[in-house]
Design a protein with these regions (language model features):
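Bacterial N-terminal signal peptides that target proteins for export
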Residues: 1-14
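Predominantly soluble domains enriched in secretory-pathway, periplasmic, or organellar proteins
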Residues: 19-379
Length: 379
């Protein structure tokens, strides 16, 4: 396959590029300081909580629609199936997985790979688009009389019908990885493994059929490209939009920019914006705007990006809180600030003024906004 890299700037000699996508996931909640009516959001928020439940919050009314009790203890991580019909939930020990029917709000199944004194923890989980199997990164911890023996990370295919490991997938070049970012093509026929290079596997026998060689110079003097986590809700299927950073060793500085990845064509469209800062990043549903969250001790800012003209529009200081994450609502007019605790702050996306706060009856461990079906064609 041919490789593409579209850049809207002149590449400096010996420029090292490092890209990481920063994405950044009962009693009725109380809402304080309700402001004037705005365009209604129509998504659904799924919050795993220390109560041992998945709380379902309606964006339009900001009311709790219900709770799904977890059978595996405190849920801490939620992964949606490709068609959004299932939730794959992991517990706080990362030993147990529960599969939940999203529409019926019922548990379908649970499983663990732990046996006896050997604990097997699942550090990465990705379902295939047809919900027939999971790709897992596992590690075994065995308790001896005086110590724990920690086994190597293992990449496996777990069959959901037989509830058994179908195969162990060899690590590229036999080199173990502590984690593996895995993405499937929309039809499920290809699996992309993110790393130093992007390895492309067919999913019948999981043999490598192609690779996106990121270590090759993109043009004379250019360096390599690395991907971090890619947000499945940021773009249409097969595309991923995020904030990238570029390291310039000659000037000893990092430059950030907006990038859009098309995996099928092995293409990155990258647009530099300015000096890099560590930011959380969230794309508005119309993909015309994106927002960054800068946080440092006593310094918190909202950043606004124009995705049509690839530029930074504004930086707005706000009060913030010590631990926080950000997400744009499904209407694109509000920004959620959340993370530790039981509150979600809503900020106006135009003025960045605090509009109101939603207070839940339990502290959250994860936050996932499921956009309405119009965000994902065919759903």
């Amino acid at each position: 396959m041919r490789e593409f890299f579209t850049m809207r700037f002149s590449v400096l000699p010996a420029l090292l590029i490092a890209c990481s996508v920063l994405a950044a996931q009962t009693s009725a909640p109380q809402t304080r300081g309700r402001g004037p009516a705005t365009q209604a959001a129509s998504g659904t928020i799924y919050l795993s909580t220390y109560k041992g439940t998945i709380t379902i919050l309606d964006e339009a009314t900001e009311k709790v629609l219900g709770e799904i009790p977890s059978k595996i203890g405190v849920p801490v991580d939620v992964t949606f199936s490709d068609d959004r019909s299932r939730l794959y939930v992991q517990d706080a020990s990362f030993e147990k997985v529960e599969i939940i029917d999203r529409v019926k709000r019922e548990s379908i199944d649970t499983f663990t790979l732990t046996e006896g004194a050997a604990k097997t923890r699942i550090w990465s989980l990705q379902p295939d688009p047809h919900d027939k199997y999971l790709i897992l990164v596992t590690k075994k911890y065995t308790l001896n009389a005086d110590r724990w023996d920690i086994g190597p990370p293992t990449l496996v295919q777990y069959d959901l019908a037989t509830k058994k490991i179908a195969r162990t997938i060899p690590w590229p070049k036999g080199e173990e990885r502590e984690g593996a970012g895995v993405i499937f093509s929309p039809d499920g026929k290809l699996m992309y493994m993110m790393g130093e290079d992007i390895l492309i596997y067919e999913t019948a026998n999981f043999t490598e059929v192609d690779r996106w060689d990121l270590s090759r110079p993109l043009e004379p003097g250019a360096g390599r490209v690395n991907f971090g986590g890619l947000d499945p809700f940021s773009d249409e299927p097969g595309f991923y939009t995020g904030l990238f950073t570029m390291q310039d060793p000659l000037q000893n500085r990092r430059i950030m920019g907006i990038g859009r990845v098309e995996l099928a064509k092995k293409k990155i469209d990258f647009h530099p914006i300015g000096p890099a800062r560590g930011l959380g990043f969230s794309v508005a549903p119309d993909r015309k705007r994106a927002y960054g969250l800068f946080r440092d001790i006593g310094e918190y800012e909202f950043w606004t990006f124009d995705l049509e003209n690839y530029r930074l529009i504004s930086r707005t200081p706000f009060r913030g809180r010590p631990r926080m994450a950000m997400r744009v609502n499904s209407a694109g007019n509000m920004i959620y600030i959340y993370q530790a605790g039981n509150t979600i702050d809503l900020y106006d996306a135009a003025t960045f003024k605090l509009v109101r706060t939603i207070t839940l009856d339990g502290d959250m461990t994860s936050f996932t906004l499921l956009p309405p079906p119009t965000r994902r064609p065919g759903l």
